[in-house]
């Protein structure tokens, strides 16, 4: 037996003599294919000693103010003979009393990977702090409709369609062209020499920004925001022989006159690179940092994915009325996380609730010469709103308007709406109070967050955060994990290491160069073992949660098969496998796209489009849509512009495949092989999500001779301290993968579930 040591927040706790601590370790369990697991323990007890009472702040006494919060998990480390075994968190379940006195604290230990859900909580994608500023500097030359910066790097930072902000006077313009590293052409004359500027991610919602971003090359790193040819309502088609005013005929008639058909900017919406959402998650939560083993810029199956920003069905909504423009204050700074508040970007956070006693909260808003309405949101829910007339004076809000101190915790943002430009010199938020330390002592603090000068634009802005589809951050992450069969664990550098489980890549978890092999034959208890069927399912179904757009529904009706799905089993005419079905379902929408033909002569065009309507052809919101945007050319399309039209010769089409023909590549985001919507002749692309990311793992356990071997062994400490879940285990000359290990840390008794290879 060895010595077990448990540290909670770096303090060693007292253990009962001979207390048994049993740890279960698994990362991917064949009994629950779609989930990523982590280490956890059975409940065990700690004595109510003076040391432990101090750590848990006498939790049994509920009259203690500012005591231990058992709702949250706290950092912990398990050591064996002084050597680190596992790091993670403990959760206090209850306190056992004997004779009305505390006897034992009952806790459970969890591995570090569980932190992810603890950190992001119930936050949604629109709670994220996106990296809004793409570039900044000072204009060095006055030139009409130009932004010139002799020290600029526009060719690597700025995209056509981006919003440019004159910081000095609060005006905005859209980038029409990136002329060079030092110069941009804009759609408005807003800069003079020595004016400071910012290039921003969230664009102006107008014709110019949409038209420019419809023509970008999505494969270029700086083009994180694009516009695909996906309409929210209008049906697009191509017919060189007809001319119906206002409809979706994309045929280019030469522009102007009566040829007012085609696609308008209001028919379309922006899309954001999925990698930018991952970066926003890291930017929002300081405790989350992913490794680049999977989330990197050269993993194109991932990096080339975009999410369509379809927050609501139908047209984009950016303001409360036609003449009122909204602006989210995006310049918060200051604050101290240790004191409960933090200011950053478009939101400011209050990280914990405070006792009403001894704490005060106030918000001071400077005067403005323009009438406006201001709204205060907590976790995206409106808390308070008020309207101010021009030059009404500065004013202060407090708990009467914003709620009790004890309910302040959350992510806050402020939205200003007005019919004209609003200038407010500062919004100042002050949180004052008393902090109780673990020894009962107190200290006072003052925490101030400021916005600085606010200069709102009188333009409709497509705010990226506000336009994100409605999905929880944790559900989005889990969706990506299911999509690519990913695993995650916290590595020795305290980063969240994300990898594919088992595919052809050398970066795959099962294929890493540091995989070891342990022969445990001599440690196995030969008196007891068990051989189980490897897979308790007759089939595994892979699908998307939302297959309800018009063309996807039509596909199922025509072929009696859901679009892009896979049903894997080993059934045949002479063999019917017994068991239940297991479903791997992504929380995303999956569209079927359409390559247009010229209805006049039946010739294929180079146009492919998506239609976000339901079976009744009504605008459809659906789940978040992921797709590959591809810039294509060949057939010009007609883009409506202020009563006329522009000819666009290259444009972004949506695709489920990374390539438009199988000779270039067949990787796609269907689970099962489907006829590619664009390729001619009609070709089924085999590089599916199942084939690329699940095939090795699933087919191994579906083999007729696949087994799960359950056995007991008394493993030596050198193996217990060093094994990894991708290591091989050898028993009697046969090699196995680890499904799970349960280890009694006191006796070294280990119960192993092993999968045949």
Show which residues each predicted segment covers.
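Solvent-exposed serine/threonine-rich low-complexity stretches and specific carbohydrate-binding patches
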Residues: 382-393
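Polar, S/T/G-rich
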Residues: 1-133, 200-336, 424-483, 492-493, ...
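Short, solvent-exposed secondary-structure boundary/capping segments
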Residues: 94-111, 179-192, 745-757
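A short beta-strand element within beta-rich, extracytoplasmic domains
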Residues: 348-368, 434, 726
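Short beta-strand-centered aromatic/proline hotspots
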Residues: 86-95, 171-178, 734-744
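Autoprocessing Asn-cyclization modules and mimics
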Residues: 38-45, 50-56, 133-195, 318-344, ...
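Noncatalytic modules at the cell exterior or secretory-pathway interfaces
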Residues: 403-420
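Conserved aromatic beta-strand anchor motif in extracellular beta-sandwich/beta-rich domains
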Residues: 78, 166, 374-378
């Amino acid at each position: 037996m060895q010595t077990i040591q448990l540290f909670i927040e770096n303090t060693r706790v007292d253990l009962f003599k001979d207390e048994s601590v049993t740890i279960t370790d698994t990362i991917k369990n064949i009994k629950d294919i779609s989930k990523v697991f982590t280490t956890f323990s059975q409940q065990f007890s700690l004595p109510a000693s003076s040391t432990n009472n101090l750590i848990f702040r006498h939790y049994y006494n509920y009259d203690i103010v500012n005591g231990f919060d058992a709702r949250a998990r706290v950092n912990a480390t398990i050591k064996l003979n002084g050597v680190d075994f596992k790091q993670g968190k403990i959760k206090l379940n209850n306190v056992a009393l004997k004779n009305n006195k505390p006897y034992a604290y009952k806790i459970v230990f969890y591995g570090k990977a569980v932190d992810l859900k603890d950190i992001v909580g119930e936050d949604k994608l629109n709670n994220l702090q996106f990296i809004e500023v793409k570039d900044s500097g000072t204009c060095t030359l006055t030139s009409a409709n130009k932004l010139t910066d002799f020290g600029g790097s526009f060719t690597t930072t700025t995209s056509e369609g981006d919003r440019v902000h004159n910081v000095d006077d609060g005006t905005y313009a859209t980038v029409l062209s990136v002329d060079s590293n030092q110069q941009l052409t804009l759609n408005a004359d807003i800069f003079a020499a020595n004016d400071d500027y910012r290039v921003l991610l969230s664009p102006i919602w107008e014709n110019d920004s949409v038209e420019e971003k419809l023509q970008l090359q999505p494969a270029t790193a700086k083009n994180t925001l694009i516009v695909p040819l996906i309409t929210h309502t209008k049906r697009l088609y191509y017919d060189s022989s007809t001319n119906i005013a206002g409809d979706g005929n994309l045929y280019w008639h030469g522009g102007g006159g009566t040829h007012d058909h085609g696609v308008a900017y209001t028919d379309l919406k922006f899309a954001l690179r999925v990698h930018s959402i991952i970066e926003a998650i890291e930017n929002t939560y300081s405790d989350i940092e992913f490794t680049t083993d999977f989330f990197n810029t050269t993993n194109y199956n991932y990096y080339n994915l975009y999410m369509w920003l379809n927050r609501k069905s139908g047209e984009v909504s950016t303001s409360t009325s036609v003449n009122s423009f909204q602006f989210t204050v995006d310049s918060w700074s200051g604050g101290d996380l240790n004191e409960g508040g933090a200011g950053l970007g478009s939101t400011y956070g209050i990280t914990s609730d405070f006792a009403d006693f001894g704490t005060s909260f106030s918000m001071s808003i400077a005067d403005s010469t323009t009438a406006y309405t201001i709204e205060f949101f907590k976790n995206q829910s409106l808390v308070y709103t008020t309207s101010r007339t021009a030059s009404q004076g500065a004013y202060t809000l407090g708990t009467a308007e914003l709620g009790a101190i004890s309910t302040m915790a959350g992510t806050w943002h402020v939205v200003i709406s007005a019919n004209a430009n609003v200038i407010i010199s500062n919004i100042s938020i002050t949180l004052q109070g008393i902090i109780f330390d673990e020894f009962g002592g107190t200290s006072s603090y003052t925490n101030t967050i400021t916005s600085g000068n606010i200069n709102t634009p009188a333009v409709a802005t497509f705010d990226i955060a506000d336009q994100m589809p409605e999905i929880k951050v944790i559900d989005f992450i889990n969706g990506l994990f299911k999509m690519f069969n990913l695993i995650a664990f916290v590595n020795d550098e305290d980063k969240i290491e994300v990898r594919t489980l088992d595919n052809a890549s050398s970066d795959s978890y099962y294929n890493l160069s540091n995989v070891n092999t342990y022969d445990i034959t001599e440690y196995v208890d030969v008196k007891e073992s068990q051989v189980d069927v490897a897979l308790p399912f007759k089939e595994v179904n892979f699908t998307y949660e939302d297959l309800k757009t018009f063309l996807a529904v039509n596909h199922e009706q025509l072929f009696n098969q859901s679009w892009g799905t896979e049903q894997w089993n080993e059934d045949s005419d002479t063999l019917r496998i017994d068991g239940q079905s297991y479903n791997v379902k992504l929380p995303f929408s999956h569209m079927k796209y359409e390559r247009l033909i010229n209805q006049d002569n039946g010739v294929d065009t180079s146009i492919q489009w998506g239609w976000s309507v339901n079976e009744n052809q009504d605008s459809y919101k659906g789940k978040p849509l992921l797709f590959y945007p591809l810039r294509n050319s060949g057939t010009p399309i007609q883009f409506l512009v202020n009563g006329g039209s522009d000819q666009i010769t290259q444009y972004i089409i949506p695709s489920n495949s990374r390539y438009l023909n199988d000779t270039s590549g067949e990787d796609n985001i269907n689970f099962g092989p489907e006829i590619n919507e664009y390729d001619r002749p009609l070709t089924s692309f085999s590089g599916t999500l199942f084939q690329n990311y699940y095939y090795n793992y699933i087919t191994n356990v579906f083999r007729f001779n696949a087994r799960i071997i359950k056995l007991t062994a008394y493993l030596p400490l050198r193996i217990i301290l060093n094994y990894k879940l991708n290591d091989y285990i050898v028993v009697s000359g046969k090699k196995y993968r680890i499904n799970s290990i349960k280890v009694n840390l006191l006796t070294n008794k280990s119960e192993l579930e092993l999968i045949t290879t």
